């Protein structure tokens, strides 16, 4: 563009914040500026990226517009601050070195192999042909290989692999896709794979990937090292191999996730929505639960028994892609990965039940003894264990169930900030949350803290994030329950930092997590539909209607309490609650049948326990219903009974039987409903009617309270909100009355989001107090 007037030339300094370091952002700015004929500089500093651009006003406007629209795959912008500066007649655009005193403020999340790297991986003329650790600034390991900030190679597990001249040249070239790609490597200078037998001894073979695939297709179970840990892998179409994996893992019914080459290949056994497909092929590459086709159980026997969905994932590491490339004969067609492929692999976390994910090579051989027949290891150390993230496909959207690889440590942006908070989360499905300013950083999924190993993982995760983000907390939030490990950890942290300890009620935190995700701090109604959490009255809650304000919460209502003979045992043995309900209502025949079904001659004595604790938990109500309807008496994995009840009802139109629900002192009592539905010959219809009635009764209660409290915003959260049939029906009923409904979508509605809620409760309270 020719410039006729000096006055049309301007200069600006742009301060760009967000995920803009370690993701190819400076080369992106460089190319963008060059294409618009601008001059200036770009550099990283401790606060983000600083760009100085000089040129015609029109070009500057186009540059800013394109800056927001044409981002690199892993980059995201939170804010751009522009400042006019003097025109200096700059002659070129250059990338400057990071300021010596700057520390990168963000570690990007791990990312699935990008399309450019995939093309190179399977191009026999490329120097990285079939190299299992190919990556660039747009993909590859990040969080899981980083020990400390700044995010530079010496701070990662790649520090032991000096780059060869070719890789170093790429690393230094601002126009190269691998410019400052910290894990950059090739077969000459980088990590390599090893194939080992079940004892850890090397397997003699010409090609490790080819031999691994041969053994998997021959029915063997392999442990394969990935980004955040090992997977146990077998042929998903081999019923014998799947059954053997279940036997070895002591996992009789819990569903397995499977990996397939693409949507076309997956369409034989699942139906994938457009939004689910987008997530499957995103840099995060989560597992997505998708509805089964009619052929699914025939094609993949034993993968997801008694369920209507299968968790699927696409290849996301070079090793995954190489297995599928090998399976279809190493084709020369560059679009080979778009073709149908018969290979389907079980990909399940490599760990003994409930233990942390295995990440070390020697650890894998030791801890997976008796489970894996062979091991594919490599010598790039995993520093931070990180499970696969899990989402579920719903009618209109997708919802996170487990937030881990690909999402950690990406921040949740809060409406406002405050003093730093560390929240240590709940007992089950634990995560912790650390805040800095208006950013909330959640740890990866930790799991249940009933095991010492998981407790150690939680403590290390908190320490790691606090070091990375230089967080010194003023407040430590935790659950009300005094006996949780997360509470003990919070007490230790409060002493360590001389910080104030703030206990937060479990369901209050559930609702606050949804508020944090959606940027809410005004009063809301919260419907917490959950398993069990300790209430302020020292009783187990779980079916609560709360009024949540910045100052705190008020319990407005709950479902009527039901008895739990055996207390916490009822979470696994739903028959206990079923027996109690049958016994208290004189259903002798039903009680005797139940005793035979569960092979418990002493069932009458258990049902007669006079001192059984009471709970308002909707989760326990689901457990009771599943047993009373004959769907599931004993859960072999957490949540099995409610999940199977939901699956049983799918495809049936539920009838509203609210006439069978008594309201006692404002609390809906569902016992009469359960008794009536338990007499149905068709248990699938019983399940459908149960959920429809639940939705109708709960919605009616919320609508009534909304009118009284003059609050139009409703947050749904808790473990039961993973039941998409229930929540989507609730949403429809509430929105028909023009209520605004919010759910956890990017942060799990189950206990995986509780730590975020704990932290937001503290920050809301502080903000409210400061305004007074």
What residue spans do the PLM features occupy?
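Intrinsically disordered, low-complexity, mixed-charge
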Residues: 1-194
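Internal gly/pro-rich beta-alpha loop/helix module
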Residues: 70, 170, 328-415, 610-615
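A phosphate-binding glycine/aspartate-rich beta-alpha loop in the early core of alpha/beta enzymes
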Residues: 84, 229-294
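A contiguous, well-structured pocket-lining segment that forms one wall/lid of small-molecule binding clefts
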Residues: 179, 183, 190-192, 426-464, ...
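Short glycine-rich phosphate-binding loop at a beta-alpha junction
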Residues: 223, 470-483, 709-720
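Conserved phosphate-binding catalytic cores of ATP/NTP-utilizing and phosphoryl-transfer enzymes
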Residues: 267-272, 322, 357-362, 388-389, ...
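Conserved phosphate-binding/catalytic loops in two-lobed NTP-binding clefts
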Residues: 479, 497-510, 712-717, 724, ...
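Glycine-rich phosphate-binding/hydrolytic loop that grips phosphoryl groups
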Residues: 507-529, 534-535, 574-583, 688-692, ...
């Amino acid at each position: 563009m020719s410039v006729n007037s000096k006055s049309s030339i301007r200069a600006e300094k742009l301060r760009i914040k967000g995920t803009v370091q370690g993701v190819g952002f400076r080369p992106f700015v460089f190319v963008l500026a060059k294409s618009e004929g601008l001059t200036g500089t770009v550099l990283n500093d401790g606060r983000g990226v600083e760009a100085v651009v000089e040129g015609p006003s029109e070009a500057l406007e186009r540059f800013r517009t394109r800056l927001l629209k044409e981002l690199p795959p892993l980059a995201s912008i939170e804010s751009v601050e522009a400042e006019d500066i003097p025109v200096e007649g700059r002659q070129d655009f250059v990338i400057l070195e990071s300021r010596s005193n700057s520390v990168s403020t963000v570690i990007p999340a791990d990312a699935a192999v990008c399309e450019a790297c995939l093309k190179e991986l399977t191009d026999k003329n490329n120097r990285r042909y079939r190299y299992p650790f190919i990556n660039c600034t747009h993909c590859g390991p990040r969080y899981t290989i980083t020990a400390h900030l700044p995010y530079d190679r010496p701070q990662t597990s790649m520090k032991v692999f000096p780059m060869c001249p070719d890789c170093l040249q790429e690393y230094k070239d601002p126009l190269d896709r691998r410019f400052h790609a910290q894990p950059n490597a090739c077969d000459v200078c980088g990590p390599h794979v090893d194939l080992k037998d079940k004892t850890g001894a090397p397997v003699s073979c010409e090609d490790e990937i080819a031999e691994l695939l041969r053994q998997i297709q021959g029915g063997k179970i392999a442990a394969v090292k990935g980004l955040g840990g090992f997977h146990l892998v077998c042929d998903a179409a081999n019923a014998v191999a799947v059954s053997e994996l279940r036997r070895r893992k002591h996992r009789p019914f819990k569903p397995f996730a499977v990996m397939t080459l693409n949507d076309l290949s997956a369409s034989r056994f699942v139906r994938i929505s457009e939004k689910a497909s987008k997530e499957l092929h995103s840099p995060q590459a989560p597992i997505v639960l998708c509805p089964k086709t009619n052929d699914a159980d025939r094609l993949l026997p034993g993968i997801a028994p008694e369920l209507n969905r299968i968790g699927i994932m696409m290849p996301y590491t070079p090793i995954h892609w190489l297995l599928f490339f090998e399976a279809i004969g190493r084709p020369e067609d560059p679009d080979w990965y778009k073709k149908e492929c018969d290979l389907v692999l079980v990909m399940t976390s490599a760990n003994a039940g409930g233990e942390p994910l295995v990440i070390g090579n020697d650890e894998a051989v030791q801890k997976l003894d008796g489970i894996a027949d062979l091991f594919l290891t490599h010598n790039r150390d995993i520093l931070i264990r990180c499970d696969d993230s899990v989402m579920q496909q719903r009618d209109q959207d997708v919802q996170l169930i487990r937030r881990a690889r690909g999402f950690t440590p990406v921040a949740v942006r809060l409406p406002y900030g405050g003093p730093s908070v560390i929240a240590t989360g709940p007992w089950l499905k634990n995560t912790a949350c650390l805040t800095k300013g208006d950013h909330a950083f959640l740890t990866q999924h930790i799991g249940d803290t009933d095991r010492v190993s998981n407790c150690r993982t939680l403590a290390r995760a908190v320490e790691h994030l606090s070091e990375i983000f230089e967080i010194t907390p003023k407040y430590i939030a935790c659950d009300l329950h005094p006996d949780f490990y997360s509470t003990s950890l919070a007490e230790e942290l409060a002493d360590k930092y001389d910080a104030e300890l703030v206990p937060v009620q479990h369901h209050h935190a559930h609702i606050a997590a949804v508020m944090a995700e959606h940027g809410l701090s005004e009063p809301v109604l919260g419907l917490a539909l959950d398993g069990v959490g300790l209430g302020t009255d020292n009783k187990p809650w779980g079916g609560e209607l709360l009024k949540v304000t910045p100052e705190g919460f008020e319990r407005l209502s709950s479902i009527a309490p039901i008895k739990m003979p055996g207390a916490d045992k009822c979470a696994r043995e739903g028959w206990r609650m079923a027996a109690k309900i049958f016994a208290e209502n004189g259903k002798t025949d039903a009680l005797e049948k139940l005793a035979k079904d569960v092979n418990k001659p002493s069932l009458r004595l258990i049902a007669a326990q006079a001192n059984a604790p009471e709970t308002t938990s909707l989760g326990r109500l689901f457990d009771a219903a599943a047993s009373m309807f004959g769907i599931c008496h004993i859960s072999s994995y957490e949540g099995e009974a409610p999940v199977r009840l939901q699956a049983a009802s799918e495809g049936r139109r539920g009838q509203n039987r609210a006439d069978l629900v008594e309201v006692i002192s404002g609390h809906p009592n569902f016992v009469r409903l359960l008794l009536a539905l338990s007499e149905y010959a068709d248990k699938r219809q019983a399940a459908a009617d149960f959920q429809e009635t639940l939705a109708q009764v709960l919605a009616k209660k919320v609508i009534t309270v909304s009118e009284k409290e003059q609050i139009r915003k409703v947050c749904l959260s808790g473990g039961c909100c993973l039941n998409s049939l229930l929540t989507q029906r609730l949403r429809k009923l509430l929105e028909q009355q023009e209520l605004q409904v919010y759910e956890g979508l990017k942060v799990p509605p189950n206990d995986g989001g509780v730590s975020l809620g704990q932290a937001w409760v503290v920050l809301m309270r502080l903000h409210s107090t400061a305004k007074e």
